[in-house]
Amino acid sequence: MSEKTVKVQLVKSLIGTRESHRATVRGLGLRRLNSVSELQDTPAVRGMINKVSYLVKVIA
């Protein structure tokens, strides 16, 4: 059975954000603006996305 995945895209700049939020975005594998990362759909990843929901967009 294939693993469920989720794609996230960084849509807002990290300038002026909290250090913990920058670390969370980095943990999601996002570096530059508009970069996309495909991750396994786990509760931990969902929590990270929820924490920085104002910076990222789920695209798939």
Swiss-Prot record:
<comment type="subunit">
    <text>Part of the 50S ribosomal subunit.</text>
</comment>
<dbReference type="GO" id="GO:0006412">
    <property type="term" value="P:translation"/>
</dbReference>
<protein>
    <recommendedName>
        <fullName>Large ribosomal subunit protein uL30</fullName>
    </recommendedName>
</protein>
<dbReference type="InterPro" id="IPR005996">
    <property type="entry name" value="Ribosomal_uL30_bac-type"/>
</dbReference>
<keyword id="KW-0687">Ribonucleoprotein</keyword>
<keyword id="KW-0689">Ribosomal protein</keyword>
<dbReference type="GO" id="GO:0022625">
    <property type="term" value="C:cytosolic large ribosomal subunit"/>
</dbReference>
<dbReference type="InterPro" id="IPR036919">
    <property type="entry name" value="Ribo_uL30_ferredoxin-like_sf"/>
</dbReference>
<dbReference type="Pfam" id="PF00327">
    <property type="entry name" value="Ribosomal_L30"/>
</dbReference>
<dbReference type="InterPro" id="IPR016082">
    <property type="entry name" value="Ribosomal_uL30_ferredoxin-like"/>
</dbReference>
<comment type="similarity">
    <text>Belongs to the universal ribosomal protein uL30 family.</text>
</comment>
<dbReference type="GO" id="GO:0003735">
    <property type="term" value="F:structural constituent of ribosome"/>
</dbReference>
